[in-house]
From Swiss-Prot:
PROSITE patterns, per the entry: SMALL_CYTOKINES_CC
One of the GO BP terms on file: positive regulation of cell migration
Quaternary structure and interacting proteins, as annotated: Homodimer. Interacts with CCR5.
Subcellular location(s) of the protein: Secreted
Stored SMART domains: SCY (SM00199)
Protein origin, superkingdom: Eukaryota
Expression induction or repression: Up-regulated in SIV or SHIV infected monkeys with decreased CD4+ T-cell count.
Keywords: Chemotaxis, Cytokine, Disulfide bond, Inflammatory response, Secreted, Signal
Expression sites by tissue: Detected in peripheral blood mononuclear cells and lymph nodes.
Gene: CCL4
Protein name: C-C motif chemokine 4
Family of this protein: Belongs to the intercrine beta (chemokine CC) family.
Positions of disulphide bridges: C34-C58, C35-C74
One GO MF term: CCR chemokine receptor binding
Length: 92
């Protein structure tokens, strides 16, 4: 019985010292969102209020536009209209 209590105590202690934050190297946080497809059509400029670029860890680059209604739309960063919207949002 003493052996079981000792082993259980050691397991609890070991679990207490293990931290999920230590399981991955610093700076290796997974991306919060990635795009796997792009919108097929140009968004009306007056619908777009903000944007962000996806992480370089994603399989393909993308610009994510936030609309007035709170939707997020993935767009191809090589498209001319996407670059124009990004520049416009940066200036404002």
């Amino acid at each position: 019985m003493k052996l079981c209590v000792t082993v259980l105590s050691l397991l609890v202690l070991a679990a207490a010292f293990c931290s999920p934050a230590l399981s991955a190297p610093m700076g290796s946080d997974p991306p919060t969102s990635c795009c796997f497809s792009y919108t097929a059509r140009k968004l009306p400029r007056n619908f777009v209020v903000d944007y962000y670029e996806t992480s370089s860890l994603c399989s393909q680059p993308a610009v994510v536009f936030q609309t007035k209604r709170g939707k997020q739309v993935c767009a191809d960063p090589s498209e001319t209209w996407v670059q124009e919207y990004v520049n416009d949002l940066e200036l404002n």
